Amino acid sequence: MIREISNLQKDIINIQDSYSNNRVMDVGRNNRKNMSFRSSPEKSKQELRRSFSAQKRMMIPANYFSLESLFLLVGLTASLLILPLVLPPLPPPPFMLLLVPIGIMVLLVVLAFMPSSHSNANTDVTCNFM
């Protein structure tokens, strides 16, 4: 009986120790939760400017467009804007020519849903390509 009481007291002491340890950990967690990770507005604006300037540099490198290609693009844009205003309207194409894109689309839909002519259709599809 005396042994049981001493073991019981040890268990109570162990429970109290673990409770106090958990409480210390909770206080540390609560202190971290209350901390604000926000920096000053000036610092965040500088970081934002830095990230935008880095993105601009990555999007358009210095040697992406040569001078000749830039002139070509400007000339093409100008011709697409000016020529429709200057040239007379063209007559409509023949009716049969208008059916060509529709025929191509119908052919592609038929080919997409057509079953394959593979003799052994029970095998795994991926093993045929590997």
Curated annotation (Swiss-Prot):
Keyword Cytoplasm on entry: yes
Keyword Transmembrane listed: yes
Region annotation Organ Size Related (OSR) domain: where it falls in the sequence: 65-116
Induction, as annotated: By auxin and ethylene (1-aminocyclopropane-1-carboxylic acid (ACC)).
Record note on disruption phenotype: Reduced aerial organs mainly due to changes in cell number and the duration of organ growth. When associated with ORS1 disruption, reduction in organ size.
Main location as per UniProt: membrane
Tissues where this protein is expressed: Mostly expressed in flowers, inflorescence stems, leaf primordia and young leaves, and, to a lower extent, in siliques, cotyledon vascular bundles, roots (pericycle and root tips) and mature leaves.
InterPro entries registered for this protein in UniProt: ARGOS/ARL/OSR1
Keyword list, A-Z: Cytoplasm, Developmental protein, Endoplasmic reticulum, Membrane, Nucleus, Transmembrane, Transmembrane helix
GO biological processes: cellular response to ethylene stimulus; positive regulation of organ growth; regulation of cell population proliferation; regulation of developmental growth; response to auxin
TM spans (from-to): 70-90, 94-114
Bilayer topology annotation: Multi-pass membrane protein
Cellular component terms (Gene Ontology): cytoplasm; endoplasmic reticulum; membrane; nucleus
Domain notes: The OSR domain is sufficient to promote organ growth.
Family: Belongs to the plant organ size related (OSR) protein family.
PANTHER family: ARGOS-LIKE PROTEIN (PTHR36023), PROTEIN AUXIN-REGULATED GENE INVOLVED IN ORGAN SIZE (PTHR36023:SF16)
Role, per record: Promotes cell proliferation-dependent organ growth. Takes part in the AXR1-dependent auxin signaling pathway that requires ANT during organogenesis.
Name this protein carries in UniProt: Protein AUXIN-REGULATED GENE INVOLVED IN ORGAN SIZE
Provenance organism: Arabidopsis thaliana
Gene transcribed to yield this protein: ARGOS
